[in-house]
Swiss-Prot record:
InterPro entries: Anion-transp_ATPase-like_dom, ATPase_ArsA/GET3, ATPase_ArsA/GET3_euk, P-loop_NTPase. GO terms for cellular component: GET complex. Its main location: cytoplasm. The keyword Endoplasmic reticulum applies. The lineage of its organism: Eukaryota, Fungi, Dikarya, Ascomycota, Pezizomycotina. ATPase required for the post-translational delivery of tail-anchored (TA) proteins to the endoplasmic reticulum. Recognizes and selectively binds the transmembrane domain of TA proteins in the cytosol. This complex then targets to the endoplasmic reticulum by membrane-bound receptors, where the tail-anchored protein is released for insertion. This process is regulated by ATP binding and hydrolysis. ATP binding drives the homodimer towards the closed dimer state, facilitating recognition of newly synthesized TA membrane proteins. ATP hydrolysis is required for insertion. HAMAP family: Asna1_Get3. It holds the Pfam family ArsA_ATPase. ATP binds at K34, G35, G36, V37, G38, K39, T40, T41, E245, N272. The active site is at D63. Homodimer. NCBIfam families: GET3_arsA_TRC40. This is ATPase get3. Gene3D superfamilies: P-loop containing nucleotide triphosphate hydrolases (3.40.50.300).
Length: 340
């Protein structure tokens, strides 16, 4: 059900994320699932474990809710900054609803940056807005800025809820098609458009259409390169996060099928908020909920027998702050053993 992953046979059935931490070839790790299942806690905790064995780790939130700041108790923005208490773990929060001008920005930015200087007039902005998933494009554009710097050994994505996550992963293909169409129109109507733009003073920044297309083509090449990395199981994997309930299990199955259709590796599932009532517990609600969770947990283990299924307990306190995240992260690599 998962695409081929580079894991040792001994790790294949291990109920932990240790195999992902051990896989030194990984460059991109996505963490996603239905809303409210603990994606941010899981992604932060996984990043903490990776920081123990990697030179540099970048944690990126593409969720508009931006819970990284709440999780670490530290304000993050669109520029990467070190997480307090770490020397090799940085974090950033991208606003996928940011202005399209940030992506197609005019102006005087560096000439060697494919993201820079993409000045557009209203016609080009209208074209950009017509591209499906343009809000996710904003996130992807910010990611590419980090990629070009080559300063992080591994990047962990704390993604938006399921539907947005999958659109984000599809965006490279969408943009490639859109730019191909734009290039085709330019070859057919380029002289006429340049004439019209010239009469109106040209594009912002004094560019002509050909220069704009060259910069957009450079961006397309970068996106294409990253997209190919996403489909390489040596470089990329997707960690699914869920809870032991019907809707969450349904969303997880749908997500795994779609990830597989896009050739994106996934071989790990984190099941959060599990109850482990003590033997003889008189809490009827606890016992009933545990019975329900056990049913869906068994279905998960049956459906995904070739996955690393990590069972995480429901905790009595919120997992916020460095110390609590570190304790939670230990359970991702050392399977939780419920008390007797």
């Amino acid at each position: 059900m998962s695409s081929t992953a580079v894991v040792h046979d001994d790790d294949l059935m291990e109920p932990s994320l240790q195999s992902i931490v051990n896989q030194k070839t990984l460059r991109w790790i996505f963490v996603g699932g239905k809303g409210g299942v603990g994606k941010t806690t899981t992604s932060c905790s996984l990043a903490i474990q990776l920081a123990k064995v990697r030179k540099s780790v970048l944690l990126i939130s593409t969720d508009p809710a931006h819970n990284l700041s709440d999780a670490f108790g530290q304000k993050f923005g669109k520029e990467a900054r070190l997480v307090d208490g770490f020397t090799n773990l940085s974090a950033m929060e991208i606003d996928p609803n940011g202005s399209i001008q940030d992506l197609l920005a005019s102006g005087d930015a560096q000439q060697d940056d494919p993201m820079a200087g993409l000045g557009v007039n209203n016609m080009m902005q209208d074209l950009a807005f017509s591209i499906p998933g343009v809000d996710e494009a904003m996130s992807f554009a910010e990611v590419l800025k980090q990629v070009k710097s080559l300063s992080y050994e591994v990047i962990v994505f704390d993604t938006a809820p399921t539907g947005h996550t999958l659109r984000f992963l599809q965006f490279p293909t969408v943009l490639e098609k859109a730019l191909a169409k734009l290039s085709q129109l330019s070859s057919q109507f380029g002289p006429m458009l340049n004439s019209i733009l010239g009469a109106r003073g040209g594009l912002p920044g004094g560019q002509n259409l050909d220069e704009l297309l060259q910069k957009m083509e450079s961006l397309r090449e970068t996106i294409s390169e990253v997209n190919s990395q996403f489909k390489d199981a040596d470089l990329t994997t997707f960690v699914c996060v869920c809870i032991a309930e019907f809707l969450s299990l349904y969303e997880t199955e749908r997500m795994i099928q779609e990830l597989t259709s896009y050739s994106i590796d996934t071989h790990a599932i984190v099941v959060n908020q599990l109850l482990f009532p003590k033997d003889g517990s008189e809490c009827d609600q606890c016992n009933a909920r545990r019975k329900m969770q056990k049913k869906y947990l068994e279905q998960i283990e049956e459906l995904y027998e070739d996955f690393n299924v990590v069972r995480m307990p429901l905790l009595v306190e919120e997992v916020r702050g460095k110390e609590k995240l570190e304790k939670f992260s230990d359970m991702l690599v050392h399977p939780y053993v419920p008390p007797n």
